[in-house]
Amino acid sequence: MFCVQCEQTIRTPVGNGCSYAQGMCGKTAETSDLQDLLVAVLQGLSAWALTARELGIVDHEIDSFAPRAFFSTLTNVNFDSDRIVGYAKEAILLRQSLAIRCRLIDSTITVDHPLAELQLDSDDIPTLQQQAQQFTLNNDKAEVGDDIHGLRMLCLYGLKGAAAYMEHAYVLGQFDEQIYAQYHAYMAWLGTQPRDVDTLLNNAMGIGKMNFNVMAILDRGETQAYGDPQPTSVNVRPVAGKAILISGHDLKDLQMLLEQTQGTGINIYTHGEMLPAHGYPELKRYSHLVGNYGSGWQNQQIEFAKFPGPILMTSNCIIDPNVGNYGDRIWTRSIVGWPGVNHLEGEDFTPVIEQALGMAGFPYNELEHLITVGFGRQTLLNAADTVIDLVATKKLRHVFLVGGCDGSRTERSYFTDFARSVPQDCIIMTLACGKYRFNKLDFGTLEGLPRLLDVGQCNDAYSAIMLAVKLSEKLGCTVNDLPLSLVLSWFEQKAIVILLTLLSLGVKNIYTGPTAPGFLTDNLMAILYEKFGMRPITTVEQDMKAILGH
């Protein structure tokens, strides 16, 4: 086992990465190794998809399957070894079928790629785990060096984050053949074990640019299906009644659950990255979408244990449900998996609903506590002139984007303290689950504008980018000349690709924390600082002084 993809990876003086019987996330060595094998199979599949395109063959099933299967290897998504193997088997069947179609056009066709003909050695998991040792991500690290290895991981993990957003978009009926072609090109290239520093850096930026287009179609899918988010008050305290909790990012799953629970007397609560759903007109019209429950994903073992109903996980992040003894009432969907828990294959939530009806639910209404969400792309763009006027009249000094992933590391209190320290003549935009560090605090208003603007999920960084672009156009300057600073927390691969997207667009002077990614060496961090001014957080006082000048 070797895995260094998330922020909580083991760090030692001799190297970083989880490499023992179990990762810090709870992923076993078996599952980790099988995920490496799956990635190798998917890289071979992408090599064939590229060759097929040269022959005029575009296989939409492969285009949708490949990023979905890759998504299953993201941090805190799928811990079920059998299902990981199932994805690998399906990938090989799809590859073989595509090869037959290619050879009907050109019987001599071959694919010059080391993984193009990769087969599984067995159906037996121990044998497959042994085979997977060939594809452990640090196999040639001693040969190529830490910097090359780190750049490979930057590209691989960035592409993994983009694959997740591609799947979210596809679920909403949004896809783009050019994006799929780019995805396959990067995936196949990574399977060749690239060693050139400049190519690795350039392709990392290319993955970031590709992801900007992915976020654009995802934004389109969400707003076409559910309307543009509107500022909306959300109760974060329970109300009396039977309950289902839904977590993850998949708004379509939430919509289907709301439809299927209408008239049942069951209240639906969002958790984690589902919070922004309350701002979408076509979702908030359901009266039994009553509020948001809990905080950051890392607290779920305590919070889920106290929730008096079933829990539906639609994407990341899931952690061991046995710790809180709620494994019998957590349900997984799509690419999510945990061994021994209930998995829903289709779109019928009847088993979840029946379980909720058989449970007590919340016994009484707690005192209401409202927070505001729904400052999506259109709302932000509509406010652009107001922001410009406030800046021009010196009533608004600076805008901070403080957000990203949450996690359990104690150093993450920095982001709470930073938000608290933002001066009264400044506003804060936030997004992703990092907002839970401070989104229940009262920041008041500035000239009628809320000082805390919840932009949405992690992919809604697109909304913040579009606001920055519009402001820069109106003011006749670059994005980097705006009174805007980004202070981002990271945990997993979606955050990595959003960072690559920002860097690829030329956004500079980003502060990141709580720690640098374990795969980025000091040399690589120095390169990112030199090229983009990207820097690790230090102390709130020091960073605030550096940003505001005093």
Curated annotation (Swiss-Prot):
Which Gene Ontology BP annotations are present? response to hydrogen peroxide
Q: Provide the binding site for [2Fe-2S] cluster.
A: C3, C6, C18, C25
Any GO CC annotation of this UniProt entry: cytoplasm
* The entry's keywords: 2Fe-2S, Cytoplasm, Iron, Iron-sulfur, Metal-binding, Oxidoreductase
Coiled-coil stretches noted in the UniProt entry, renumbered to this chain:
none
- Signal peptide boundaries: none
* Residues the entry annotates as binding hybrid [4Fe-2O-2S] cluster: H249, E273, C317, C405, C433, C458, E492, K494
EC assignment: 1.7.99.1
The reaction(s) this protein catalyses: A + NH4(+) + H2O = hydroxylamine + AH2 + H(+)
SUPFAM superfamilies named among the record's database cross-references: Prismane protein-like
Modification Cysteine persulfide, positions: C405
Is the keyword Cell inner membrane assigned to this protein? no
What cofactor does this chain's UniProt record say it requires?
A: [2Fe-2S] cluster; hybrid [4Fe-2O-2S] cluster
Q: Which GO terms describe its molecular function?
A: 2 iron, 2 sulfur cluster binding; hydroxylamine reductase activity; metal ion binding; peroxidase activity
Cell compartments where the protein resides: Cytoplasm
Q: How is the cofactor bound?
A: Binds 1 [2Fe-2S] cluster.
Please report which protein family the annotation says this sequence is part of.
Belongs to the HCP family.
What does it do? Answer: Catalyzes the reduction of hydroxylamine to form NH(3) and H(2)O.
Mind telling me what this protein is named?
A: Hydroxylamine reductase
Originating species: Yersinia enterocolitica serotype O:8 / biotype 1B (strain NCTC 13174 / 8081)
Gene symbol?
hcp
